[in-house]
Amino acid sequence: MKAGIHPNFKKATVKCACGNEFETGSVKEEVRVEICSECHPFYTGRQKFASADGRVDRFNKKYGLK
């Protein structure tokens, strides 16, 4: 690797909109995110399942399939 062309890698504080903070490595000192693993529905188990009432479901209902 060439010397002097790589950015300085330092500890960064990641701040989420929910108030959660944690440290990681980055070229920036502070990173702000809208969603993290503490508030994301997939990780918290509060995931909403959208019912897919699309064309296939309407077809199956109309013709008595399924």
UniProtKB/Swiss-Prot annotation:
Query: What keywords were assigned to this record?
Result: Metal-binding, Ribonucleoprotein, Ribosomal protein, RNA-binding, rRNA-binding, Zinc
- Superkingdom to which the source organism belongs: Bacteria
Q: Is Metal-binding set as a keyword in this record? A: yes
Q: Which residues bind Zn(2+)?
A: 16, 18, 36, 39
**Phenotypic consequence of residue 36 to A:** The protein does not accumulate and cells grow very slowly
Among the Pfam families in the record, one is Ribosomal_L31
Question: How many cofactors are bound and how?
Answer: Binds 1 zinc ion per subunit. This zinc stabilizes the protein.
Tell me its cofactors.
Zn(2+)
State the Gene Ontology BP annotations.
Answer: translation
Quote the subunit structure annotation. Answer: Part of the 50S ribosomal subunit during exponential growth.
PANTHER family per the record?
50S RIBOSOMAL PROTEIN L31, CHLOROPLASTIC (PTHR33280), LARGE RIBOSOMAL SUBUNIT PROTEIN BL31C (PTHR33280:SF1)
* Role played: Binds the 23S rRNA.
Similarity comment text for this entry: Belongs to the bacterial ribosomal protein bL31 family. Type A subfamily.
Q: What is this protein called?
A: Large ribosomal subunit protein bL31
List the gene name.
Answer: rpmE
